[in-house]
């Protein structure tokens, strides 16, 4: 990383999370994350639309593409998406100002993503959605009720 990036007011730190399904080594992943224009957006309501995502995230810059996360079995929204900007600066603005804001009565979280690849739009949980929704103990109407494993007991 260039020294200028360390001194830049616009530089947004990487989180500790790393995609365990990333194909490549840790160094490659770090490099992609540091230069990426793509954000992972989590904790969305299952009812949040692509239009709502676009309206919110376009306040930080020009959005190139939005990919909504889908349940791999039902092909319905499952609470996450990827937002790609044309520039890193616009993506950094979103990380700084949109992370932790409320959308559809939910506090959303953003994180850097190494770049969208086909197939990543599908939930990785056994029941088709996100893994975190399988183990949820509390009732969450915005994310399908109780966790899938709790429902099956």
From Swiss-Prot:
Q: An example Gene Ontology cellular component term from the record?
A: cytoplasm
Q: Which gene encodes it?
A: ncbp2
Q: Which UniProt keywords apply?
A: Cytoplasm, mRNA processing, mRNA splicing, mRNA transport, Nonsense-mediated mRNA decay, Nucleus, RNA-binding, RNA-mediated gene silencing, Translation regulation, Transport
**All copies of domain RRM, residue ranges:** 37-115
Q: Which organism is it from?
A: Xenopus tropicalis
Known partners and oligomeric status: Component of the nuclear cap-binding complex (CBC), a heterodimer composed of ncbp1/cbp80 and ncbp2/cbp20 that interacts with m7GpppG-capped RNA.
Q: Supply the InterPro entries for this chain.
A: NCBP2 (IPR027157), NCBP2_RRM (IPR034148), Nucleotide-bd_a/b_plait_sf (IPR012677), RBD_domain_sf (IPR035979), RRM_dom (IPR000504)
Cross-referenced Pfam families: RRM_1
One annotated GO molecular function is: mRNA binding
Name of the protein this chain belongs to: Nuclear cap-binding protein subunit 2
In terms of domain of life, where is this protein from?
Eukaryota
